[in-house]
Design a protein with these regions (language model features):
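Cysteine-centered catalytic environments shared across enzyme families
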Residues: 1-163, 172, 370-380, 405, ...
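Adenosyl-5′-phosphate
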Residues: 16-23, 33-35, 45, 61, ...
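Conserved S/T- and glycine-rich ATP-binding loop of Class I adenylate-forming
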Residues: 88, 190, 317
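A glycine-rich phosphate-binding loop feature that marks nucleotide/adenosyl-phosphate handling sites
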Residues: 90, 192, 383-387
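Short catalytic/ligand-binding loop motif for oxyanion handling, primarily in non-cytosolic enzymes
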Residues: 94-97, 152, 195-199, 204, ...
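Active-site catalytic pocket residues across diverse enzymes, especially alpha/beta-hydrolases
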Residues: 101-105, 204, 353
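Short low-complexity, flexible loop/linker segments enriched in glycine and/or proline
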Residues: 156-160, 202-204, 391-394
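Active-site adenylate/phosphate-handling loop in enzymes that bind or generate adenylated species
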Residues: 174-237, 322-345
């Protein structure tokens, strides 16, 4: 699961005999043992109902209802007996969240931005825009810069806090440390905005691939032949062909398969090289990666946008982002709250979102009563640039085709999780 997706999908864990209780479910434990988990909540079910009953309202009413639901969620997440802080980058999610916190009544919000010495003075440096937004909304702001030497000194503690292997989370560890160093015990995060409002490129790429591969994917032999052809060509080219290229026909005809291609790191046939033939064969058989992904679409929302919200919210956000925030923040005794990840909020605005098209992030950006600065509101998605892979792997100029996330996954596994090693 880790090599295929960058994190271990629930209910699996790092330990063969241990299973996680799936999110949104419960189990009874008594003298007879442990019952099978029973689901009481489902992201897919909420979205399926929304797709069946879309809210056909005016654009003005849609905006106002979404704004009211967002402010309501933020207000509840601000309730605390200690001062509340917020992670602030220069992205639209966290900046909008700070504006909404102001509308929800926060008067002493502490905002913290994490910066990197290597990026200072470049377009990747988020600290100047974040500081501008903090001043715009009148928050008590702090900027925390880290460099390669501090990262390397802290890295053993990062690995010790990481309870299961994941290619993400290190950014959450350091921003949580920065917030905790300011004396904050509770902080808001904008996590969930991309999943809820279609901020990822996957919301366009996956449906497009499903349409393109619909007919050829009906011929199983064609997909296998394409994989073999690309595999034979790849070693002969000076520029490496992605292992995913030949798999588009095999997997691209379904939302589960196309999503796996979009989010996957390694393909199943690459695993024997990484972990041995027997372990790879046994792991793939028990995991059933397409089955795991397919469960996120039960019941099926039957609409492209709603399906993607279900997939990204269930598989990427829940299995990876939220888990990473949890272990990373708890390493610093910090409670992180995510107002955009809320079942009641999803029920309120899903019928409004499925009934419209285009950039749905516009509703979040337009929600603060004091508008974001125009150059922030109109800023495209850049992601949170973190140089940690460069700090571990080097500058990447001579590292070959796997300097990126794949190379980082290999290195992380070798450093901390290889069976004969370990932390």
């Amino acid at each position: 699961g880790f090599f295929l997706r960058g994190a271990i999908p629930e209910p699996f864990t790092l330990y063969e005999a241990v299973r996680a209780l799936p999110a949104g479910s419960f189990a009874w434990i008594d003298e007879r043992g442990v019952s099978e988990p029973q689901a009481y909540a489902s992201v897919a079910a909420i979205l399926a109902d929304a797709a069946e009953h879309p809210a056909q309202v005016s654009e003005a009413e849609r905006q106002e209802r979404i704004r009211a639901a967002l402010v309501d969620s933020v207000r509840y997440h601000l309730v605390a007996d200690v001062r509340v802080g917020a992670f602030l980058s220069s992205g639209r999610d966290s900046t909008s969240l700070v504006g909404l916190a102001r509308d929800a009544g926060s008067v002493d919000l502490k905002t913290v931005t994490l910066g990197f010495a290597e990026y200072e003075g470049t377009v990747r440096d988020e600290t100047p825009l974040a500081a501008e937004v903090a001043q715009h909304y009148g928050t008590d702001h702090a900027t925390r810069m880290i460099d390669r030497s501090e990262f390397r000194a802290e890295f053993p503690r990062v690995l010790a806090a990481m309870d299961q292997p994941t290619v993400d989370g290190i950014n959450s560890y350091f921003v949580s440390k920065a917030v905790a160093d300011c004396g904050i015990k509770v902080a808001l995060s904008g996590t969930g905005g991309d999943e809820l409002l279609g901020g990822y490129s996957s919301f366009r790429a996956v449906p497009r691939l499903v349409r393109a591969a619909a007919l050829p994917s009906r011929l199983p032999w064609l997909g296998d032949a394409a994989i073999k052809l690309y595999g034979a060509l790849a070693p002969k080219r000076s520029v490496r062909i992605s292992q995913k290229s030949g798999a588009k026909i095999k997997y691209g005809g379904s939302f589960a398969g196309a999503y796996f291609l979009k989010r996957g790191m390694f393909m199943p046939w690459e695993l024997p090289e990484l972990m041995g033939e027997a372990a790879a064969r046994d792991g793939l058989s028990r995991l059933d990666i397409l089955g795991v992904i397919g469960k996120a679409l039960v019941p099926d929302p039957r609409q492209a946008f709603a399906r993607m919200v279900a997939l990204e919210s269930t598989l990427y956000m829940r299995d990876q982002l939220l888990r990473d925030i949890d272990w990373a923040a708890m390493a610093h005794s910090l409670e992180v709250r995510v107002p955009l990840v809320e079942a009641h909020l999803l029920r309120e605005i899903a019928p409004l979102l499925v009934a419209t098209k285009g950039d749905r992030k516009r509703y979040l950006v337009a929600s603060p009563s004091k508008p974001l600065p125009p150059h922030v509101a109109q800023r495209g998605k850049t992601g949170f640039n973190v140089p940690v892979r460069q700090w571990v792997l080097g500058d990447g100029k001579s590292k070959g085709p796997e300097f990126g996330m794949r190379g980082w996954a290999r290195r992380l596994y070798e450093m901390a999780w290889r069976p004969e090693g370990g932390i």
